[in-house]
């Protein structure tokens, strides 16, 4: 099996259809991972692709694509939230499309030594890059209230207080260093759900999000995409959990000039004339697109995926950040 294709890129056909790559276009694959989206773009059209990934392991896969598509593919090391600065360093200020596949990759989950998996024992790390604090740093140093808040807000763990208390009690005896130890403590507090989801799932998600500042990266990437895309360029985002999708949905609705309706049964009203700037995007599809059953059977990871796509208008980018104020 080719080193670039041991895992399936989620909703690849839908992503390519939404982006509509064309010859001589310049596209950004903000989450290179295993290179599925980049390869799809390069094979679909005679375009150029700039990929971004903070994971050092991506460099080998990127080098293979650079050799296969000389002059058309470049991998930049860094966070996709910094795409504006990364592209500026390459002399690029305008692009035709951005694809973002959010969250942790299957490869990272499969490698126990990366510390993302609660099913395989490994060091309690969870960093997508090599910089910053690890998950072990968080669970061994944060006070109980702060730890509970993280588990609740970023993992939507309803028993966050109980989990945090159990973690603090256990670390008083022996600090955490392995994923299996943390998962065991969590499973001792949280029952397995009826749908079979592992009790450690939500807590591990919360820690991973905080370690890698995933939601902050997403907000920065959305704003950067808005500023970089030329009129007619498209932004396509595939999210895997509700926290990500809420941010993307709110950004899309705001930038498309849609207000939050007072009732889901009433039509959406435009807020473009209510003191807001004109819409910088228009929706490609009215609702989030879900993967086909055929894909979820082959790739169960895709079941929770939600794709949202928008097209850049001719109006200027907003000065308000996706998650902040003007």
UniProtKB/Swiss-Prot annotation:
Gene Ontology CC: cytoplasm
Top-rank taxon: Bacteria
Pfam families in UniProt: Methyltransf_5 (PF01795)
Chloroplast among keywords: no
SUPFAM superfamilies: Putative methyltransferase TM0872, insert domain, S-adenosyl-L-methionine-dependent methyltransferases
GO annotation, biological process: rRNA base methylation
Region (Disordered), start-end ranges: 260-306
Keyword Acetylation attributed: no
Major location category of this protein: cytoplasm
One GO molecular-function entry: rRNA (cytosine-N4-)-methyltransferase activity
Entry EC no(s): 2.1.1.199
Keywords, alphabetical: Cytoplasm, Methyltransferase, rRNA processing, S-adenosyl-L-methionine, Transferase
Residue positions binding S-adenosyl-L-methionine: 35-37, 53, 80, 101, 108
Family affiliation: Belongs to the methyltransferase superfamily. RsmH family.
Annotated PANTHER family: 12S RRNA N4-METHYLCYTIDINE METHYLTRANSFERASE, S-ADENOSYL-METHYLTRANSFERASE MRAW
Record's function text: Specifically methylates the N4 position of cytidine in position 1402 (C1402) of 16S rRNA.
Name of the protein this chain belongs to: Ribosomal RNA small subunit methyltransferase H
Organism of derivation: Rhodospirillum rubrum (strain ATCC 11170 / ATH 1.1.1 / DSM 467 / LMG 4362 / NCIMB 8255 / S1)
